[in-house]
């Protein structure tokens, strides 16, 4: 079944995506080496709520986190924990935002400073090139 979206629905979806981008950018600016992944999860929740949005994943199928966060070779859908972020950790965050009953859900990966691990840089560049 195909559900057609109204102009209002499409506008709300665009707003949700704009909020997602703001949360992503602010999260990347504020996450620092020495934070735990649970602190990153809590920060993401604060940022999402700041824009009057809802963290989509929280309590979905009993998921305990606000976002999914995985470090280095962990599989996606990781849960924030007491793991302390280290220099050159590769972090993948999957963020779902519900805004006006519409969802924006996407993941991104970045390398924590000083970002001088050439093997991690290569995998990110190769993956990006394949997707684009």
Whereabouts are the PLM-identified features?
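Active-site neighborhoods and metal-handling regions in enzymes and metal-associated proteins
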Residues: 1-132
